[in-house]
C-alpha cells in the first residue's frame, strides 16, 4: 500500500510526501492457522521452505523553499521501521534498512554506518552484510544555487543512522559485537552520523546529473579521536 502527495506545481514552497506499508507472510500464516497449525508456531514452511512474516513502514518527506529564480533550500526526511513476528525471528537481509551512499549520508559508503554504535568488522565483506537495521532515520538539508546556465552548485548537510529493536542475540560474541545497536531515545542525537559537503548539479530537464563531495563530521562509535567531531 502506498500513499503519495505532491503539491500543485503553482506552489512556491512545494512538498512531496510518500508513505509505503508492506507485509509478508500474513496470508500464508492465516492459511496455516485454518489448517490446524498455531499462529505462534515457528519454522512453518511453504513448499518445504520457511517463510518470513513482517510488517514494514517507510515514509519520505521533501519540502522545497524557493528563495528566488536561481536558488532554493531543500529539506528531506526519510524514516522507516520493520518488525518481524509469527514465523520469523529474523528479517530477510534484503528488506532491512541501511544508510550511506549518494541518497542518504553522502560522505559515507553504502552500508558504512550502523546499526547504532556498531563500528563495523575488519572484514568489509562481512561488515557490509551486517550494517543494516530494523529502524532508519535520515535527514538532509541542501542549498542549491545557479552558477551559470544549467549548472548549479549545492551545499549539503546529512544526518542519520539505522538501529535494531533489541540486542537479544543467542550468541555471546554477537551480543558483544552489537552492543549499543539498539534504538534508544536517550542516545538518539549522539547516534546520528553527520556529514557535510558541496556538489554540482547539471540540469538536462529530463535528468539531473549530480557530483557530490562530502566529509564526515561525527561518527556514532569510538574512533579514537576525542570530542563530538570525531571523524578521522
Predicted features along the sequence, with ranges:
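Strand-loop-strand
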Residues: 174-204, 229-231
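Flexible, small/polar- and glycine-enriched "cap/hinge" segments at structural transition points
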Residues: 158-160, 165, 197, 201, ...
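Residue-level detection of beta-strand scaffold positions
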Residues: 143, 154-156, 199-201, 208, ...
Amino acid at each position: 500500500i502506498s500513499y503519495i502527495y505532491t503539491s500543485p506545481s503553482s506552489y512556491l514552497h512545494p512538498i512531496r510526501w510518500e508513505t509505503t506499508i508492506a507485509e509478508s507472510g500474513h496470508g500464508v500464516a492465516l492459511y496455516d492457522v485454518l489448517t490446524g497449525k498455531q499462529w505462534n508456531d515457528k519454522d512453518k514452511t511453504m513448499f518445504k521452505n520457511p517463510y518470513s512474516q513482517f510488517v514494514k513502514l517507510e515514509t519520505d518527506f521533501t519540502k522545497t523553499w524557493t528563495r528566488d529564480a536561481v536558488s532554493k533550500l531543500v529539506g528531506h526526511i526519510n524514516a522507516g521501521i520493520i518488525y518481524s513476528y509469527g514465523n520469523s525471528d529474523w528479517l530477510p537481509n534484503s528488506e532491512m534498512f541501511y544508510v550511506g551512499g549518494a541518497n542518504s549520508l553522502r560522505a559515507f559508503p553504502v552500508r558504512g554506518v550502523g546499526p547504532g554504535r556498531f563500528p563495523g568488522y575488519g572484514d568489509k565483506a562481512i561488515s557490509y552484510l551486517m550494517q543494516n537495521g530494523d529502524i532508519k532515520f535520515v535527514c538532509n538539508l541542501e542549498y542549491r544555487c545557479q552558477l551559470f546556465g544549467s549548472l548549479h552548485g549545492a551545499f549539503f548537510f546529512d544526518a542519520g543512522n539505522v538501529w535494531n529493536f533489541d540486542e537479544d542475540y543467542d550468541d555471546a560474541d554477537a551480543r558483544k559485537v552489537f552492543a549499543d545497536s539498539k534504538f534508544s531515545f536517550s542516545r538518539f542525537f549522539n547516534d546520528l552520523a553527520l556529514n557535510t559537503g558541496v556538489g554540482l548539479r547539471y540540469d538536462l530537464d529530463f535528468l539531473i546529473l549530480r557530483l557530490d563531495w562530502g566529509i564526515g563530521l561525527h561518527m556514532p562509535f569510538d574512533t579514537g579521536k576525542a570530542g563530538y567531531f570525531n571523524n578521522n
